Amino acid sequence: MKTKLNIKLYDEKLLWCTLCLLLIGVTMVTSSSIPIAYRIYHDMLFFTKKQILYLVILFFIFKIFLDVPISFWQKNNKIILLISISTLLLVLIIGNSIHGSLRWITISYVSMQPSELSKLAMFCYLSNYLSQKNSEIVNNFGGFLKPIIIISFPLILLLVEPDLGTTIVILLTTLSLLFISGTKIQKFIPTILIIVVTTTVLIIKSPYRFERIMSFWNPWNDPFGKGYQLTQSLMALGRGNIFGMGLGHSIQKLEYLPEAHTDFIFAIIGEELGYIGACTILFMIFFISFRAFKIGKIALKNKIFFSGYFAFSIGLWLIFQTLINVGTTIGLLPTKGLTLPLISYGGSSLIIVSIAIIILIRIDFELRMKNIQAFYKTDI
């Protein structure tokens, strides 16, 4: 008999890293939201209490979803996609308009952002499609176009909201997954050209997007108008320097920087925790992404294709969304309205991203269980 196999059932590093980011998120939401929470609700901890409530909900979600086998997601991928499309249609009918965008559905005191669910739903569907029709996608151009055409309908709904940021994250992740599946680089050229032309037309024809682009090129031309948010963000980052001003000592959060606790929370992180603190948080997010890639690689090696592609899609999603959020904060990209995963205030983003990571942990768990079963089979 061989010695007892010493394999941990869960990826503890992934679990602890996620938990640390969630706690950092609550801390930074508290610090960045106190002024606006007091002005609007006369309660300095209004947003903190809601964020903690989301974490409590996450605790129960974790216990439920961790027991859900990956086969459930594969079998029900089309239903999940249809539910996502239904909510995207619903938001256009009864959604609340915020800053010119229809992104929220509010029922009583509960609000949800359908675009967050759309990411998980589309990557679930795409992972199943790639796992079943990989040879068709790799060997002919029609097979390559099919998944892009299928996801184009929900993407159009996202553009109607408009939510260009989520659309870009989904497109980049989709193209990256197709590349990972073995598709030759030549097939991407016409698709990328179409995307570039379409994006350019959408920007030119939409005053909302065009203004964002113009303010991005040189925010200092109109620092108190169209370039106000970006200039305030850059001032926050510049003030933070290497070590930061200290937790709670941000000046820009005193309602100088709009969306300080949501889309632009990274600027407050840079101001209070400095370059070192900001880079540490980015490292932790990228650590989760690279763990996802490692898990995906192991799954593909074991020919568990759905789990492999799903794991890769989660890792790519986190990387692209983080890069776009940080890029807008530091002035490298136009404002997109995307949250910083696991950090920014907001229930929809926090819960959906956390569910994605729970799925990732479940994929890893099933791979470990397979190794344990294989060990005991050879042991007998």
From Swiss-Prot:
Q: What is its main location?
A: membrane
Subcellular location field: Cell membrane
Classification via Pfam families: FTSW_RODA_SPOVE
Which pathway does the protein contribute to?
Cell wall biogenesis; peptidoglycan biosynthesis
Q: Which InterPro entries match?
A: Cell_cycle_FtsW-rel_CS, FtsW, FtsW/RodA
Keywords for this protein: Cell cycle, Cell division, Cell membrane, Cell shape, Cell wall biogenesis/degradation, Glycosyltransferase, Membrane, Peptidoglycan synthesis, Transferase, Transmembrane, Transmembrane helix
Q: Which family does it belong to?
A: Belongs to the SEDS family. FtsW subfamily.
Name of the protein in question: Probable peptidoglycan glycosyltransferase FtsW
Organism of origin: Buchnera aphidicola subsp. Baizongia pistaciae (strain Bp)
User: Which gene codes for it?
Assistant: ftsW
